Amino acid sequence: MCAPGYHRFWFHWGLLLLLLLEAPLRGLALPPIRYSHAGICPNDMNPNLWVDAQSTCKRECETDQECETYEKCCPNVCGTKSCVAARYMDVKGKKGPVGMPKEATCDHFMCLQQGSECDIWDGQPVCKCKDRCEKEPSFTCASDGLTYYNRCFMDAEACSKGITLSVVTCRYHFTWPNTSPPPPETTVHPTTASPETLGLDMAAPALLNHPVHQSVTVGETVSFLCDVVGRPRPELTWEKQLEDRENVVMRPNHVRGNVVVTNIAQLVIYNVQPQDAGIYTCTARNVAGVLRADFPLSVVRGGQARATSESSLNGTAFPATECLKPPDSEDCGEEQTRWHFDAQANNCLTFTFGHCHHNLNHFETYEACMLACMSGPLAICSLPALQGPCKAYVPRWAYNSQTGLCQSFVYGGCEGNGNNFESREACEESCPFPRGNQHCRACKPRQKLVTSFCRSDFVILGRVSELTEEQDSGRALVTVDEVLKDEKMGLKFLGREPLEVTLLHVDWTCPCPNVTVGETPLIIMGEVDGGMAMLRPDSFVGASSTRRVRKLREVMYKKTCDVLKDFLGLQ
C-alpha cells in the first residue's frame, strides 16, 4: 500500500504537466478566417451593371455569410448592400476564397436553386447562376406575369432573385375582330404576323389595365408597369412631368439616379424621396398610333400617411374657389414638393411649395388634391384607350389627345373607361370637348421654360393693358416691367411706352396663348420679324413667379443657352 503523500505528489505533478501543455496551444490559436463566397460582384465586373436593378433592395446584408452559397453581398442602388448572384470572369490566375478543399468535382453535388448550375471554383464545387443563354427565341410566359425570350432567361431571372418561377399559359390578344374562325383561346407560344401582313393588320397601342395612383413612404421602393398591346408591338418610353423643365425621356435598360427602366419597360424607383413625387407618363408608339398614360406617385414621410388620410375624410368641405387659384410658388423659406389642382388641365400636378400660404391650393398627396377639387367628372377625352383584360374584342373609337384625332382600338368588353365610343362620329361629337361647350383645353407651349427662353428672340416681364381681337389674329399692348432678353428690337430705348405684340393664328373661341388683360404679371416669350414682336399659339406665356424669374436669371448668368446651342440647333 502506498503512502498518502505518494498520491498527493503525483497529483500535483500531473496538474503542472497539463498547464505546461495547454499554454503553447493557446499561443498557437489561429486567427478567425473571414469567409468569402466565390465570384465577384456585378458592378466589379462592369461599372454599368448595377446590382438589384429589378428587385426591392430589401435583401440587405453585411457579409457574404448572410447570403446563399451562390451569392455575394454587393453594393446596390439604394446605398446599402444586397445578396445577389455572383458573377465570374474567365481570367487565368484569379484566386478564389481561401480554406476550401481542392480537386472536388460536381459529381453528386446538387444545386437546388432554379437556374443555378454547379461549377468548380478553386477546387470547390459551388452553385452559380447561369450567365449564358441560347439565342434562339422560344417566348415563355412565367408565373411572375412576364414573358421571357426563352426558358433559360426565365430560369436565370429566378436564380438572380432567389425565387422559383414556373411556366404558365400565355394570354393571346387579338389585334382586331376577325371573320375567320377564332384561333385557340390560349397558346404557349404567341403567334406573330409576318412582315407582309403588318400593313393590313395593324392596331394602335391600348392599355390592358387602368393606370393606378400609388402613395409610398420615404425610403420605400415603387414600380409602375405600363401593360400595353398593339400591332406591331409598341415601343415604350417613360418620362416625369417636370415643372418649368424639359422632361427626360427614359427607355428600357436606362438608369438615372434612383430611377430605373427595366428591360421589360417597367419603371422602378428605389429609396423614394419627396422630390420623386409627381406624374410619370408612359408613352407607347407604333406605326398605327401613339398612347400616353399617366401614373401619379405621392410620397409621404413616415407617420404622415395616416394623418393625410384622416384629414381628407374629416367631412370639412374644401372651398371651391381655392381650387381655381394658381399654385403658390413664392419662396418664403423651405421648399417642398406639393400637389395643386390645375383647372385648365382638370387634373392635379406637382409644384414647388415655398410655404408662403397665400392660398389653400396645395396638398400632400395626389389623392387628397383630387378629393378636394375634382368636383366634376374626369375629362374623359384625356384618358388613354383602355382594352381591358376581357376577350370580347370589339372595335371601338377613342380620342387621342396627342394627335387630336379619334382613332380605332380593340375593346375587350370589360373594365374600360369613358374614352370609349361605338363610332367615329360619336367620338368626334364628344371630344376634345362636347360641341357647343366652351370649355377649352389648356394652352401648351412647344417647349418648357429654359428651352423657350433660349429659342425666343425676346423675353419680357409685363402686364397686358389692352387686347384687340381680329379675324384670326390680334394685338396686345404690354406694359413692360423688365426686359430679360432682346436680340432684335432695342427695347431698352422704349422707356415706359407699352410694347405692341401681334398674335398670329388665333382661334378666339379658345385662344392660345392665353393672353388676358389684367394686373397679373406675365412672362412673355416670342419672335421678332421685321422689327415686330409676335406670339404664336405655342409661344410661352405664363404667370410670373419668384422661382421662375430666379431660374431665368440663373440661365442668363450661367450662359446656359450657349451650352445648349448645339443641341437646340440655334444659330
Swiss-Prot record:
Entry GO terms, CC: extracellular region; extracellular space
Function recorded in the entry: Protease-inhibitor that contains multiple distinct protease inhibitor domains. Probably has serine protease- and metalloprotease-inhibitor activity. Inhibits the biological activity of mature myostatin, but not activin.
Location of the Kazal-like domain: 121-172
Organism: Mus musculus (Mouse)
Residues the record marks as site: Reactive bond: K135, E136
Compartments reported by the entry: Secreted
The name this protein goes by in its record: WAP, Kazal, immunoglobulin, Kunitz and NTR domain-containing protein 2
Ig-like C2-type domain residues: 205-298
Sequence ranges assigned to domain BPTI/Kunitz inhibitor in this UniProt record: 323-373, 381-431
NTR domain: residues covered: 440-561
Tissue distribution: Widely expressed, with high expression in skeletal muscle and heart. Also expressed in brain, lung and testis. Weakly expressed in liver and kidney.
A single GO BP: transforming growth factor beta receptor signaling pathway
All copies of domain WAP, residue ranges: 34-87
Subunit structure: Interacts with both mature and propeptide myostatin/MSTN.
